């Protein structure tokens, strides 16, 4: 077997030759990227590890353990399409399951359910959201009890500090429709979205999120939301990668990043199939990204 280091060199040279001389270079390059993924996984230079302990469980993160391997990845996969192809191939070559449910079987009796607490303000809309979230959690083995708070910030703080397992907060709670206040509360409390629901109001609908520090991602997730500190050029490349993976970008926003002077981009992605390849792409090429949530709309 050729050593991984030599294999990377051969693949890189082949890629350079393809770029300069061969016809149908895109087809040949695709094969080289696939071979790169195989070598990465087979050599152990790339590892996939499930999240354990206090965190968003049910996902696996990928890491490149060799600086040389990472250098070859960056050299061979400069475009969004190549990056997407590499991560799809890595997904295929890895055998571990992404979905690790703590409670894989639906539980039908309240006496079997584990009690969790959700913090929220007291009003008709939050109560309506709580009813939907309670039914959702019960299907996955949890019985929800409400902890009343005076403000949305207090509810988010309760989930962040461990006084509650979740908080129930509206996404569109600010003048711009959905953005600053909501994402600030998530960021400051290190909270992630577990699921969302639309609640009817007299003026339309308000989307509420169930957010917490620790929960299980479920198979029915249809939305992947993340943020990354980057520039406009890289943000455009991320959009191309998302499209190449077969997903749909539903929403993109940019905010001034605190203490840095740059921009923080938020991406909301509609998933087609699994999210593993997208997560791998972010792990490898944008390791400073922050997961906002992987969830479904109930």
Task: Please give the residue ranges for each predicted region.
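Domain-level signature for soluble enzymes in the chorismate/prephenate branch of the shikimate pathway
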Residues: 1-298
């Amino acid at each position: 077997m050729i050593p991984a280091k030599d294999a990377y060199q051969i693949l890189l040279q082949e890629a350079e030759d393809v770029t300069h001389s061969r016809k149908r270079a895109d087809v040949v390059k695709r094969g080289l990227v696939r071979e790169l993924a195989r070598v990465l996984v087979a050599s152990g230079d790339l590892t996939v590890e499930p999240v354990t302990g206090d965190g968003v469980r049910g996902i696996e993160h990928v890491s490149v353990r060799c600086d040389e391997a990472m250098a070859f990845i960056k050299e061979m996969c400069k475009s969004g399409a190549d990056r997407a192809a590499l991560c799809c191939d890595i997904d295929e070559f890895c055998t571990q399951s992404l979905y690790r449910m703590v409670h894989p079987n639906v539980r039908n009796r309240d006496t079997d359910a584990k009690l969790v607490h959700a913090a929220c303000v007291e009003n008709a809309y939050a109560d309506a959201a709580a009813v939907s979230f309670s039914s959702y959690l019960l299907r996955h083995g949890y019985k929800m009890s409400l902890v009343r708070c005076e403000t949305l910030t207090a509810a988010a703080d309760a989930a962040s500090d461990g006084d509650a397992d979740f908080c129930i907060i509206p996404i569109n709670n600010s003048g711009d429709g959905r953005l600053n206040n909501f994402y600030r509360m998530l960021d400051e409390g290190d909270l992630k979205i577990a699921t969302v629901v639309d609640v009817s109001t007299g003026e339309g609908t308000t989307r509420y999120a169930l957010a917490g520090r620790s929960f299980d991602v479920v198979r029915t997730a249809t939305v992947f939301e993340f943020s990354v500190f980057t520039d406009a050029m890289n943000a455009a490349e991320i959009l191309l990668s998302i499209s190449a993976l077969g997903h749909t970008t539903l929403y993109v926003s940019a905010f001034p990043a605190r203490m840095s002077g740059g921009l923080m981009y938020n991406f909301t992605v509609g998933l087609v199939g699994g999210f593993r390849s997208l997560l791998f792409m972010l792990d490898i090429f944008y390791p400073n990204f922050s997961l906002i949530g992987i969830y479904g709309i109930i």
